[in-house]
Amino acid sequence: MAKTSSVEKNNRRRKLADQYGPKRAALKAIIMDQSKPMEERFRAQLKLAALPRNSAKIRIRNRCEVTGRPRAYYRKLKVSRIALRDLGNNGQIPGLVKSSW
């Protein structure tokens, strides 16, 4: 089980990313628009820099929904390899069969 503080920190980052997502996208569109004057683009860049760092989507870490483990994460199932194995052995994931040869 991951530290609760790490999981909560990641949840705060998700909430901030959802909250500031549209504003960040609008500012980035202004910054990337070559037809806008340089001063306006620079002001948009300063506004973007003033936003919280944790509101950037890139700072969100994929974590297992069951254990909070940050590594060996299956995106499709949103669980780590260890949780996947445990859930599969318990028969809680339909269609997953333990391999044996």
UniProtKB/Swiss-Prot annotation:
<comment type="similarity">
    <text>Belongs to the universal ribosomal protein uS14 family.</text>
</comment>
<keyword id="KW-0689">Ribosomal protein</keyword>
<dbReference type="GO" id="GO:0006412">
    <property type="term" value="P:translation"/>
</dbReference>
<dbReference type="Pfam" id="PF00253">
    <property type="entry name" value="Ribosomal_S14"/>
</dbReference>
<dbReference type="GO" id="GO:0015935">
    <property type="term" value="C:small ribosomal subunit"/>
</dbReference>
<dbReference type="GO" id="GO:0019843">
    <property type="term" value="F:rRNA binding"/>
</dbReference>
<dbReference type="InterPro" id="IPR023036">
    <property type="entry name" value="Ribosomal_uS14_bac/plastid"/>
</dbReference>
<dbReference type="InterPro" id="IPR018271">
    <property type="entry name" value="Ribosomal_uS14_CS"/>
</dbReference>
<comment type="function">
    <text>Binds 16S rRNA, required for the assembly of 30S particles and may also be responsible for determining the conformation of the 16S rRNA at the A site.</text>
</comment>
<protein>
    <recommendedName>
        <fullName>Small ribosomal subunit protein uS14</fullName>
    </recommendedName>
</protein>
<keyword id="KW-0694">RNA-binding</keyword>
<dbReference type="GO" id="GO:0003735">
    <property type="term" value="F:structural constituent of ribosome"/>
</dbReference>
<dbReference type="GO" id="GO:0005737">
    <property type="term" value="C:cytoplasm"/>
</dbReference>
<dbReference type="InterPro" id="IPR001209">
    <property type="entry name" value="Ribosomal_uS14"/>
</dbReference>
<feature type="region of interest" description="Disordered">
    <location>
        <begin position="1"/>
        <end position="21"/>
    </location>
</feature>
<keyword id="KW-0699">rRNA-binding</keyword>
<keyword id="KW-0687">Ribonucleoprotein</keyword>
<comment type="subunit">
    <text>Part of the 30S ribosomal subunit. Contacts proteins S3 and S10.</text>
</comment>
